From Swiss-Prot:
Residue intervals passing through the bilayer: none
Species assigned in the record: Brucella abortus (strain 2308)
Pfam families noted in UniProt: Peripla_BP_6 (PF13458)
Keyword Cell membrane among record annotations: no
Family the UniProt entry places it in: Belongs to the leucine-binding protein family.
CDD domains in UniProt: PBP1_RPA0985_benzoate-like
Lineage: Bacteria, Pseudomonadati, Pseudomonadota, Alphaproteobacteria, Hyphomicrobiales
The protein's name in its UniProt record: Leu/Ile/Val-binding protein homolog 6
């Protein structure tokens, strides 16, 4: 069955590349229902915002976006949907991918299908190494977890305990922070990996207290797990006792801040994007993306990965004249530079990963009572340290 599917991809690729397309289809795979539907909603908001600003035409070609739903990580379903999009729908580009396993599962079909993949979220460093046709416009966990180590040391914190959820991104975050923190003279006194299903954090908080650490580095999936952890951090007296919390920005993404509330105030994170980022490009983007998403409080970081992903895809379509040519499309965006809503960015010509600023943010409360990530420091032109660690 696998051989038949790949043969179909190859035949379709030859037929589709023989002529110019009047309509160029982009297949977007992501979670548009289920527990992670808000992330898919952000994908769509970013795509809609880009097309509202730039139209749906590139030269003589009309761009059409075709969506497919993978409610939660499901590599087999993701691969099957990607094959269906390429063979039956005739998409020339694959994009989206909130979960790393879903992105990894699709990489083997890119060459046979003659299609590039633009990763709009999935944050494991090694995805770009699986195929020369992968380009990333999001971030990696290593990229956002490394600078916070410097922040902790600058705050006088020499001993930290690491607490992460025990799955791929959590392990990446733990390793990234530990490498940067210990290389600069800090000590990770203990590294705790919690099962994803953990909902009682009191024993973890006691271990943190007993460790003698001055600070906590934490990485957890957004939503209920983060809410429970943050509540326990406050309720068990860690915040009031001065044990500082450091994390990548997933912990305080904007769509979670209303639920986190006062518990998140003062938390320091490093991340590639905040909705509050102060620039003309971001103000314009946020205006359009909020229209697209409907509820302004739901806008969060996956939207900017999708917005910039469409910018890269439009450049690919322009470079290929609407023809199906994955190698030429990817070559055209190597070294590409532009000013994104998040700030200045570029596509590294070697890794095809996005180089970008990483911002230190502190959760603050606005005059209207809403919570936001206030940017207070910039780490410029950050690549992906995770690629060197492979």
């Amino acid at each position: 069955m696998k051989k038949i599917a790949l043969t179909a991809l190859a035949v379709f690729s030859l037929a589709a590349s023989a002529a110019y397309a009047d309509v160029v289809k982009v297949g977007v795979i992501g979670p548009f229902s289920g527990p992670f539907a808000l992330q898919g909603k952000n994908f769509k908001a970013g795509i809609d915002a880009y097309m509202a600003e730039h139209g749906n035409k590139v030269g003589d070609d009309t761009v059409e976006v075709v969506y497919r739903d993978v409610p939660q990580a499901d590599p087999a379903q993701s691969k099957a949907l990607a094959q269906e999009l390429v063979v039956k729908e005739g998409v020339q580009y694959l994009a989206g991918f909130y979960f790393t396993p879903d992105a990894m599962a699709v990489t083997p079909i890119l060459k046979q299908g003659n299609v590039p993949m633009v990763v709009m979220n999935a944050a494991t460093s090694s995805i770009v190494t699986k195929s020369p046709y992968v380009v990333r416009t999001s971030f990696t966990t290593w990229q956002t977890s490394t600078p916070i180590a410097r922040v902790a040391l600058d705050k006088g914190v020499k001993k930290v305990i690491s607490v992460v959820s025990d799955y791929g991104p959590g392990v990446d975050a733990e390793n990234a922070f530990k490498a940067a923190f210990t290389d600069a003279g800090g000590e990770v006194v203990e590294a705790i990996r919690m099962p994803l299903a953990t909902n009682d954090f009191s024993p973890i908080m006691q271990r943190i207290k007993d460790s003698g650490a001055q600070g906590v580095f934490a990485f957890l999936p957004s939503g209920p797990t983060t809410f429970g952890f943050m509540k326990a951090y406050v309720d068990n007296g860690l915040k009031s006792s001065g044990i500082q919390l450091f994390a990548p920005g997933d912990l305080t993404q904007e769509s979670d801040l209303p639920a986190l509330g006062e518990n998140a105030l003062g938390v320091l994170t490093t991340f590639h994007y905040a909705v509050s980022h102060d620039s003309p490009e971001n103000r314009k983007f946020v205006e359009e993306a909020r229209k697209a998403i409907g509820n302004p409080a739901e806008l969060s970081f996956p939207s900017v990965g999708a917005y910039d992903g469409m910018h890269v895809i439009y450049k690919m379509i322009e470079a290929t004249g609407g023809k199906k040519d994955a190698a030429k499309a990817v070559e055209a965006v190597k070294g590409m530079e532009w000013v994104s809503p998040r700030g200045p960015v570029s596509i590294d010509p070697e890794s095809r990963h996005i180089t970008q600023n990483i911002y230190l943010r502190e959760v603050a409360k606005a005059d209207d009572g809403t919570y936001y990530n206030k940017e207070i420091q910039t780490f410029e032109k950050q690549g992906d340290p995770g690629l060197k660690a492979q």
